[in-house]
């Protein structure tokens, strides 16, 4: 059963619409659906709400520590409420999936994602759930003929807003993720994964 849903992103209005904030977009939607208000909670270093989602009590969190310090926020809340790693779902942007793709998985490495790296370090575990929201990779925007030897600027890419057509399919992917949330919060994660990956 998932007790804590974390969305990753960077704080500040200048980052709101950037690809790296896809996790925040999901949490904002969940909070709206639950009629919950995210409030600045200093002891958790983030915006926090306790929500009633699909009959279950769930903690929603948007760390306000900047991406590479996300673990500080997650571990503060997890320790306070005695939440285990496998009861945590972290929603994050995923370079290795094209826009419009969304996948669930338990555990694994960070894939170069600094937010995940910091969470794993603070929890001393990689055994938490991830909701991977595809944003694509900057190399995909380079014509194939020019890709050899090209060094795409990943840092610049994730800190820019998606193109309009990308935003539309990312929003649709987040809607599909929201559709399986009743199963997720009830602990039916295998079923949620199968349904999400079928789309």
Curated annotation (Swiss-Prot):
InterPro entries: Pept_tRNA_hydro (IPR001328), Pept_tRNA_hydro_CS (IPR018171), Pept_tRNA_hydro_sf (IPR036416). Gene3D superfamilies: Peptidyl-tRNA hydrolase. Pfam families: Pept_tRNA_hydro. One of its GO terms (molecular function) is tRNA binding. Keywords: Cytoplasm, Hydrolase, RNA-binding, tRNA-binding. Belongs to the PTH family. Hydrolyzes ribosome-free peptidyl-tRNAs (with 1 or more amino acids incorporated), which drop off the ribosome during protein synthesis, or as a result of ribosome stalling. This is Peptidyl-tRNA hydrolase. The lineage of its organism: Bacteria, Pseudomonadati, Pseudomonadota, Betaproteobacteria, Burkholderiales. The gene is pth.
